[in-house]
């Protein structure tokens, strides 16, 4: 019976069934390998994603730490930006002040010019007044009087005229002629002046 079974020919149907059963078994390992590869690749990709994500998270966490170098760099950058902004603001202020500086300079120049003009006018009028006073006051040829000396001499001349008016030495005829009276007063004042200067020098 054993020989009959072993030697019995296998029917084509049985062969096709056995082949069909073997084919899924043969096809399963590659699919399993592919699935394993896909799973491994997915795990690797997930792990890789988690890795950079973790690194990124660590970078962010490190940035939040007060003593981290990243925060120091960011602080420097922000400080640099702030300094640039302040510098820009300063530049803007400089431009505005620069726009106003020429106007103020022109105003100062105008004020200086006006002050110089007023000073020249005052000096000119003062010189003219002293020149007129020197024409009235009898002076000696050797006189080179300054302004203060001219004022002192004018005060002495007024004192001399007061003394002459108080005295009765001049008659009415001499007083009636203005030119002669002026020459007489001038000569008398010159003599009086010299005597006063001699007496003052002798007293000292």
Curated annotation (Swiss-Prot):
Annotated GO biological process: cell differentiation; muscle organ development; negative regulation of DNA-templated transcription; rhythmic process
Subcellular location: Nucleus
Organism encoding this protein: Nomascus concolor
Name of the protein described by the UniProt record: Twist-related protein 1
Segments for region (Disordered): 1-107
Listed SUPFAM superfamilies: HLH, helix-loop-helix DNA-binding domain (SSF47459)
Residue spans of biased composition, Basic residues class: 34-43
Stretch list, region Sufficient for transactivation activity: 163-193
Source organism superkingdom: Eukaryota
